[in-house]
């Protein structure tokens, strides 16, 4: 197999993840997009490791070992990220990134909502969508 196929697929996956990070407003979807970008990097690491091991006689599989390490770090990152998003959602009532720009600690002067009211059911449904 040519090196171009996994490299193009990796570039497409990374571009899709980058679009998701830049365009999405929901924090969970942003985390999913970051994971997609990490998987694109992992695919690239394995593809180049296999391609380079064809030319080298003594192969160390360092790209595959680095990929396993990256997968373990990504699993920890997504667990911590989801825990943070869940805690923010419980405290603020939304996971919309634009509404969470001002996350200062302490009581808000206007109350929990932007207009002094509690978050509505539609805002909570939007945060989970």
UniProtKB/Swiss-Prot annotation:
Main location: membrane
EC number(s) given by UniProt: 7.1.1.-
Catalytic activity, as annotated: a quinone + NADH + 5 H(+)(in) = a quinol + NAD(+) + 4 H(+)(out)
Positions in coiled-coil regions: none
Compartment(s) of residence: Cell membrane
The keyword Iron is annotated on this UniProt entry: no
Compositional bias annotation for Low complexity: 111-122
Membrane topology: Multi-pass membrane protein
Pfam families to which the protein is assigned, alphabetical: Oxidored_q2 (PF00420)
Transmembrane segments: 3-23, 28-48, 68-88
Molecular function terms from GO: NADH:ubiquinone reductase (non-electrogenic) activity; quinone binding
Any single GO BP term: ATP synthesis coupled electron transport
Region (Disordered): 98-129
Keywords: Cell membrane, Membrane, NAD, Quinone, Translocase, Transmembrane, Transmembrane helix, Transport
Top-level enzyme category: translocase
Top-level taxon: Bacteria
Assembly information from the UniProt record: NDH-1 is composed of 14 different subunits. Subunits NuoA, H, J, K, L, M, N constitute the membrane sector of the complex.
Protein purpose: NDH-1 shuttles electrons from NADH, via FMN and iron-sulfur (Fe-S) centers, to quinones in the respiratory chain. The immediate electron acceptor for the enzyme in this species is believed to be a menaquinone. Couples the redox reaction to proton translocation (for every two electrons transferred, four hydrogen ions are translocated across the cytoplasmic membrane), and thus conserves the redox energy in a proton gradient.
HAMAP family in the record: NDH1_NuoK
Family: Belongs to the complex I subunit 4L family.
Protein name stated in the entry: NADH-quinone oxidoreductase subunit K 2
Organism: Streptomyces avermitilis (strain ATCC 31267 / DSM 46492 / JCM 5070 / NBRC 14893 / NCIMB 12804 / NRRL 8165 / MA-4680)
Gene coding for it: nuoK2
């Amino acid at each position: 197999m040519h090196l171009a196929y996994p490299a193009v697929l990796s570039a497409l996956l990374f571009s899709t993840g980058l679009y998701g990070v830049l365009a999405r407003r929901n924090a969970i979807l942003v985390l999913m997009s970051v994971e997609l970008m990490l998987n694109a990097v992992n695919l690239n690491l394995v593809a180049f490791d296999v391609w380079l091991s064809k030319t080298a006689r003594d192969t160390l599989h360092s790209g595959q070992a680095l990929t396993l390490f990256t997968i373990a770090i990504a699993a920890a990152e997504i667990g911590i990220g989801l825990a943070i998003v869940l805690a923010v959602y419980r405290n603020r009532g939304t996971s919309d990134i634009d509404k969470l720009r001002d996350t200062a600690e302490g009581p808000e002067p206007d109350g929990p909502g932007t207009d002094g009211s509690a978050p509505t059911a539609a805002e909570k449904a939007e945060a989970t969508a």
